[in-house]
Amino acid sequence: MSTLLIDLKGKELEQEEVELLSHPLVAGLILFTRNFEDREQIQELIRSVRQRVKKPLLITVDQEGGRVQRFRDGFTMLPSMQAFQETLSATEQVSFAKEAGWQMAAEMIALDIDLSFAPVLDLGHECRAIGDRSFSSDVKSAVNLAINFIDGMHQAGMASTGKHFPGHGHVLADSHLETPYDDRTKDEIFGCDLQPFQQLIAQNKLDAIMPAHVIYSQCDSQPASGSEYWLKEILRKKLNFQGTIFSDDLGMKGAGVMGNFVERSKKALNAGCDLLLLCNEREGVIQVVDNLKLAKNQPHFMARQARLQNLFKRRVIDWNDLVSDLRWKLNYRNLADIQIRWLDIQAAKK
């Protein structure tokens, strides 16, 4: 049973990485800026992975837009999600959100990448980890923009991933650096932060969800990424979510309360995660592949494997054909203009 997504050290594939990626526990990989030099190089790296690892791998990236865009040179400057509401009219917002989703997904698929973890469904912009990665502080606006962004992704042939369930926007701490605590009541969380996830699930827009490394102390003592309450009781049963549940990166400091890397992996799986990200911790990856034991014949593991198959890209796009497309050309200019205007607005406030 494949469950781990791991990372690569650099711009070329190492033999140790071929062996790790070939391990039965490993389902795929996530790419970072350190793996990228230019488009030709990243395409060659992906081609090497596909050829040298003799099984289908889910290749992923965080190419959200704004400050979270791993590949820049030679790619569209994608706007931060907040930029749509801050720089455009109501009609333009939904139109360009859809185009941004399509543009991002089409460019990644043309590299032979299956999935970009997007969109961010957190509300508000105060959290250091989120900031302008979120669409809005308003539920209705965030949902409307997210629907259009996802529709663009789906049109290009990419599955969507809503993050960070049930909402990371109301904590100031950064879960990359520590475990944040959200002390609001259950009613406050369910009436606000949970709403984008609940509404998008109801409209069948989300193919995958990534929970937060945040402890919601009035609801459960575990981070959502390791919480049966959030993942089994709320996400699966109450919201009837049928898609894939990714853990956020188990190498992050916010996951540290769940123990060592093997313990974190076990807790996330037992809580209900299907696929586990473990990045920037090569020794941790080795510990997990050596010590995590999974039973292949259990029904919920079989369901996890079936859900994994729905995440692979749904079409093939040739890069040269893409950049010759008028839609891509118009988006390349217009989306960059939106981000430049947003950066100018931010600079003027300083």
Swiss-Prot record:
One of its GO terms (biological process) is cell division. The keyword Cell division applies. The active site is at residues 176, 248. This is Beta-hexosaminidase. GO terms for molecular function: beta-N-acetylhexosaminidase activity. GO terms for cellular component: cytoplasm. Pfam families: Glyco_hydro_3. Substrate binds at residues 62, 70, 133, 163-164. Pathway: Cell wall biogenesis; peptidoglycan recycling. Belongs to the glycosyl hydrolase 3 family. NagZ subfamily. It comes from the Bacteria. Plays a role in peptidoglycan recycling by cleaving the terminal beta-1,4-linked N-acetylglucosamine (GlcNAc) from peptide-linked peptidoglycan fragments, giving rise to free GlcNAc, anhydro-N-acetylmuramic acid and anhydro-N-acetylmuramic acid-linked peptides. The gene is nagZ. It is found in: Cytoplasm. It catalyses: Hydrolysis of terminal non-reducing N-acetyl-D-hexosamine residues in N-acetyl-beta-D-hexosaminides. Its EC number is 3.2.1.52. The record marks 174 as: Important for catalytic activity. InterPro entries: Beta_hexosaminidase_bac, Glyco_hydro_3_AS, Glyco_hydro_3_N, Glyco_hydro_3_N_sf, Glycoside_hydrolase_SF, NagZ_Beta-hexosaminidase. SUPFAM superfamilies: (Trans)glycosidases (SSF51445). It comes from Haemophilus influenzae (strain PittEE). Keywords: Cell cycle, Cell division, Cell shape, Cell wall biogenesis/degradation, Cytoplasm, Glycosidase, Hydrolase, Peptidoglycan synthesis. Coiled coil: none annotated.
